[in-house]
C-alpha cells in the first residue's frame, strides 16, 4: 500500500468531518504557462501533507501519473488530490487540481475550472506573464475563479541572470503589474478591484518550487527578511535554511486558505453565472449556500476510463450530499443511474468514501453515461436547467488518419478511440462507414501525439498514423438567391437562401448567451437587442449548431404539415453543416433561412429519407451561389527576444504568411505579437530558435478563423478536393438541384 493511501485512510475520518463544514473547505488548482513549474509546486504541497518524501519533492512529479507525463516532464491531464492541512488551530480540506500548461491541453483546464473557486497561478520569474498565463487567467475569470499568484524560479534571477536585490524587486513588481493588467482586462466588473494582487496583503508568494521555499511580503516583513538575504542564501549556500524557515507548502496553503473563498462564499457569486435556474427556488437557495442538506446537484468536470471499474465521473457537489447507492438523474441524457461507489482522488489513486457533501470534489462509479459538462441531480429535479455548458477556447484543427496494421483489430481500436473522446471532448473522431478510415482531430500536434500514445498503451494494437493535416472551414461572403430542394420522390419542395451569420451572433453562441435549449422568447429578445435581428427572424430560430456556429431560421407562414417535418429539416441542416460542398470541410458562420415549402399530405411520402436530402441539397446550392470561401485556422505567437534579433525573427514570420500585430520594447527584451496560419506553423519553432541563436521565448495558441487568400483560393480548393479523392472541379449549384 502506498504512503499516500495509508495517510489518506488515516486522515479519512478527519477529512469527512471537515467535508461537512464548507467554511473549512477550499477548492483550488494550479494554472500556468507550460514549464513554469506547476507540477513541481504541487509536489511541495504533497510533501506538506506527508504524501511525498521531502527528498523527492520537486523531482517526483507525483501528480504527473500518466507515464508519458513523467517522460516528457509535462502535465497533459488534470489530476485531483484532497489535502488535509491545519492552519490557525483549525483543520482544512483543500481539494487541489494540477492542470496542464501546454496550449494543446487547455480543454483540461476548462473542465477543471468548473470545480475550482481559486486558481494558484504559477509564473516563471524569468519568462514572466506569457500567452498561456493570459489564456488560463482569462478562462479562470470567465468562470468566476479567483486567482492568487506564485512567482516561481526566483533562483533563476539570482543564478542565471545574476540580478541585484533591487533588480529582483523590480522584476517581481513588473510581473505583478502585468498580472493585474490581465485582471483589469478580463475580471467581472464587480471583482476588477477586489481581485487585483496586492503583495502587501499576502496575495502573492515568491520562491523556488525546486528548492522548496516560498515567502509572502507580510511573512518577510515579520521575519525581517530582505531580498539581499535571499541572494545571500544562494551565493553562500544556505538555501536549505530558507526551505526550513519558509517551506513552500506552508506558504502556498496559507495563501490559499486566506485568499481563496470557501465554497459557501464562492457559490453566492458563481452560481448566478453558471446556472440559469430560479435562484429563489429550494434548489436555487441550496446552490447559493452550498447546503449539504439540500437536493443533490453535481457538475461533472471530467470522465476517465478505468480498466476495472469502467467510466469514472469526477465532479463537484454544488448542493446536497451524494452517497453510495443514491439514484441520480443525468439532465440532457434523460436517464437515471445508481451510484455504485463514491471516492475522493489522490493523484492516480481513488479512496472510497461513504458520502461526499456540497462544496467538495467527488468521483463516482456507476454513471457510465455521464460526460464532462453534464449535470447530475436528485431524480425529483429532472426538469431543472443544467449548468452552463463549458466553453473551449481552442478547436480541433489538426487531423491524423489512423489505420490498424491488422484490419481485424479495427473494432477494438475504434472502441478505445471512442473512450478517448469521452475523456477528452476536445478530440474529434470521424469514421467513414464505407471505407473504415479513422480520422482523429486535436488542438495541435502534441495533443494528437499524446492521444495516439494513450491509444497504443491501452489497446496494444499496432497502427499507423498519417502526417498531420489541417482542418479547415467553409463559409459564405454574401446572401444567396433562393434555391428549391426537391425530395427524391418529387412530392416535397423546400425553398432556402443562406447568408453570412454576423459576428455578434457567433459570439453569442460561443459564450452560450443563446442556446438551443433556452426559452425561445428569451433567445429572440437577446438576438433583437444584442445582434440587431428583426423580430420575425429572431422568433423563427429552429436550431443552433453550437459546434460550428450556424443557425437555421423559419420565415414561412401558414405552411401545411411543416410542423410534422420540422425535425427532418433540422437533421438535414446539421448533415449539411458537417461537410460543406466546396471540399467536405465543416461549414462555419452561416445563417440558413427557410422561406417556403410544399409538403405532401401523406406521411409515407414525407419521411426523413425524403426531407433530409431535399434540405441538404438546397442548402448546398444556396451556399455555392453566395461567394463561398475557405477559412483557415490562425495561431497567435507571443515572442520575447533580444532586440538584436527582431529583424531575423520578423523575416521568419513574414516567410510563413504571418503578420506582426504588435511590438514593444522593455530594457533588454523586445515583445512581439504575431499571427500566422496553422498550416505554416509546423517548422516555425526550429526556424525561430535558429534566427535568434536560441535567445528567444515564444508561445502559440489558437487565434481565429480567417479567409484563405483569394488569389490562391481556387487552386487550394482543388488541392483539398484531390487529397480527399473528390473530383478536382469545384461543384456548381446545379450539381445539387435543378435550375430554378
Curated annotation (Swiss-Prot):
Residues 23-264 form the tr-type G domain. SMART domains: EFG_C (SM00838), EFG_IV (SM00889). CDD domains: aeEF2_snRNP_like_IV (cd01681), EF2 (cd01885), EF2_II (cd16268), EF2_snRNP_III (cd16261), Elongation_Factor_C (cd01514). GO terms for cellular component: cytosol; ribonucleoprotein complex. GO terms for molecular function: GTP binding; GTPase activity; translation elongation factor activity. Coiled coil: none annotated. Keywords: Cytoplasm, Elongation factor, GTP-binding, Nucleotide-binding, Protein biosynthesis. The modification Diphthamide is found at residue 605. InterPro entries: EFG_II, EFG_III/V, EFG_V-like, EFTu-like_2, P-loop_NTPase, Ribosomal_Su5_D2-typ_SF, Ribsml_uS5_D2-typ_fold_subgr, Small_GTP-bd. Belongs to the TRAFAC class translation factor GTPase superfamily. Classic translation factor GTPase family. EF-G/EF-2 subfamily. Catalyzes the GTP-dependent ribosomal translocation step during translation elongation. During this step, the ribosome changes from the pre-translocational (PRE) to the post-translocational (POST) state as the newly formed A-site-bound peptidyl-tRNA and P-site-bound deacylated tRNA move to the P and E sites, respectively. Catalyzes the coordinated movement of the two tRNA molecules, the mRNA and conformational changes in the ribosome. This is Elongation factor 2. It comes from Pyrobaculum calidifontis (strain DSM 21063 / JCM 11548 / VA1). The gene is fusA.
Amino acid at each position: 500500500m502506498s504512503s499516500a493511501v495509508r495517510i489518506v485512510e488515516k486522515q479519512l475520518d478527519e477529512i469527512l468531518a471537515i467535508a461537512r463544514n464548507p467554511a473549512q473547505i477550499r477548492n483550488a488548482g494550479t494554472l500556468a504557462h507550460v514549464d513554469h513549474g506547476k507540477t513541481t509546486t504541487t509536489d511541495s504541497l504533497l510533501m506538506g501533507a506527508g504524501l511525498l518524501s521531502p527528498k523527492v519533492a520537486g523531482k517526483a512529479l507525483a501528480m504527473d501519473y500518466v507515464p508519458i507525463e513523467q517522460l516528457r516532464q509535462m502535465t497533459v491531464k488534470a489530476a485531483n488530490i484532497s489535502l488535509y492541512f491545519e492552519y490557525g488551530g483549525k483543520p482544512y480540506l483543500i481539494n487541489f487540481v494540477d492542470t496542464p500548461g501546454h496550449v494543446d491541453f487547455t480543454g483540461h483546464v476548462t473542465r477543471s475550472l468548473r470545480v475550482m473557486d481559486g486558481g494558484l497561478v504559477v509564473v516563471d520569474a524569468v519568462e514572466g506573464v506569457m500567452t498561456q498565463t493570459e489564456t488560463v487567467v482569462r478562462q479562470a475569470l470567465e468562470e468566476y475563479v479567483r486567482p492568487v499568484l506564485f512567482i516561481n524560479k526566483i533562483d533563476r534571477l539570482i543564478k542565471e541572470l545574476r540580478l541585484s536585490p533591487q533588480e529582483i524587486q523590480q522584476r517581481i513588481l513588473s510581473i505583478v503589474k502585468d498580472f493585474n493588467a490581465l485582471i483589469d482586462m478580463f475580471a467581472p466588473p464587480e471583482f476588477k478591484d477586489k481581485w487585483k494582487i496586492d503583495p502587501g496583503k499576502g496575495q502573492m508568494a515568491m520562491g523556488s518550487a525546486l528548492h522548496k521555499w516560498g515567502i509572502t511580503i507580510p511573512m518577510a516583513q515579520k521575519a525581517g527578511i530582505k531580498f539581499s538575504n535571499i541572494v545571500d542564501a544562494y551565493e553562500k549556500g544556505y538555501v536549505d535554511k530558507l526551505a526550513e524557515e519558509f517551506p513552500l507548502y506552508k506558504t502556498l496553503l496559507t495563501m490559499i486558505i486566506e485568499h481563496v473563498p470557501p465554497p459557501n462564499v464562492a457559490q453566492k457569486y458563481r452560481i448566478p453565472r453558471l446556472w440559469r435556474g430560479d435562484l429563489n427556488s429550494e434548489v436555487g437557495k441550496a446552490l447559493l449556500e452550498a447546503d449539504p442538506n439540500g437536493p443533490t446537484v453535481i457538475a461533472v468536470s471530467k470522465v476517465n476510463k478505468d480498466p476495472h471499474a469502467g467510466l469514472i465521473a469526477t465532479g463537484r457537489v454544488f448542493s446536497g450530499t451524494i452517497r453510495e447507492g443514491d439514484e441520480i438523474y443525468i439532465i440532457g441524457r434523460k436517464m437515471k443511474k445508481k451510484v455504485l461507489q463514491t471516492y475522493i482522488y489522490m493523484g492516480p489513486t481513488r479512496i472510497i468514501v461513504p458520502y461526499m457533501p456540497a462544496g467538495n470534489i467527488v468521483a463516482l462509479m456507476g454513471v457510465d453515461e455521464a460526460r464532462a459538462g453534464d449535470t447530475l441531480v436528485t431524480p425529483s429535479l429532472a426538469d431543472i436547467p443544467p449548468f452552463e455548458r463549458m466553453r473551449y477556447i481552442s478547436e480541433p484543427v489538426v487531423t491524423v488518419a489512423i489505420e490498424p496494421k491488422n484490419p481485424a483489430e479495427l473494432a477494438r481500436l475504434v472502441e478505445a478511440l471512442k473512450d478517448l473522446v469521452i475523456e477528452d471532448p476536445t478530440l474529434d473522431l470521424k469514421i467513414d462507414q464505407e471505407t473504415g478510415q479513422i480520422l482523429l482531430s486535436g488542438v495541435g500536434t502534441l495533443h494528437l501525439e499524446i492521444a495516439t500514445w494513450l491509444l497504443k498503451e491501452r489497446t496494444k494494437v499496432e497502427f499507423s498514423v498519417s502526417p498531420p493535416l489541417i482542418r479547415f472551414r467553409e463559409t459564405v461572403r454574401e446572401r444567396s438567391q433562393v434555391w428549391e430542394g426537391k425530395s427524391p420522390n418529387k412530392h416535397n419542395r423546400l425553398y432556402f437562401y443562406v447568408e453570412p451569420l454576423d459576428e455578434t451572433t457567433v459570439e453569442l453562441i460561443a459564450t452560450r448567451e443563446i442556446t438551443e435549449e433556452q426559452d425561445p422568447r428569451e433567445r429572440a429578445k437577446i438576438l433583437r437587442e444584442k445582434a440587431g435581428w428583426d423580430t420575425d427572424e429572431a422568433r423563427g430560430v429552429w436550431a443552433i449548431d453550437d459546434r460550428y456556429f450556424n443557425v437555421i431560421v423559419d420565415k414561412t407562414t401558414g405552411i401545411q404539415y411543416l410542423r410534422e417535418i420540422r425535425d427532418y429539416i433540422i437533421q438535414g441542416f446539421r448533415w449539411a453543416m458537417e461537410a460543406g460542398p466546396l471540399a467536405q470541410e465543416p461549414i462555419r458562420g452561416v445563417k440558413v433561412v427557410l422561406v417556403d415549402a410544399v409538403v405532401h399530405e401523406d406521411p409515407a411520402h414525407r419521411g426523413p429519407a425524403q426531407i433530409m436530402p431535399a434540405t441538404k441539397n438546397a442548402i448546398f446550392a444556396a451556399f455555392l451561389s453566395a461567394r463561398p470561401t475557405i477559412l483557415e485556422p490562425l495561431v497567435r505567437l507571443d515572442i520575447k527576444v533580444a532586440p538584436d534579433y527582431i529583424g531575423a525573427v520578423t523575416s521568419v514570420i513574414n516567410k510563413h504568411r504571418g503578420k506582426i500585430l504588435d511590438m514593444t520594447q522593455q530594457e533588454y527584451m523586445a515583445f512581439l505579437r504575431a499571427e500566422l496560419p496553422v498550416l505554416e506553423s509546423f517548422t516555425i519553432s526550429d526556424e525561430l530558435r535558429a534566427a535568434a541563436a536560441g535567445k528567444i521565448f515564444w508561445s502559440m495558441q489558437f487565434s481565429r478563423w480567417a479567409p484563405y487568400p483569394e488569389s490562391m483560393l481556387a487552386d487550394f480548393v482543388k488541392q483539398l478536393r484531390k487529397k480527399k479523392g473528390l473530383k478536382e472541379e469545384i461543384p456548381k449549384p446545379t450539381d445539387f438541384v435543378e435550375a430554378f
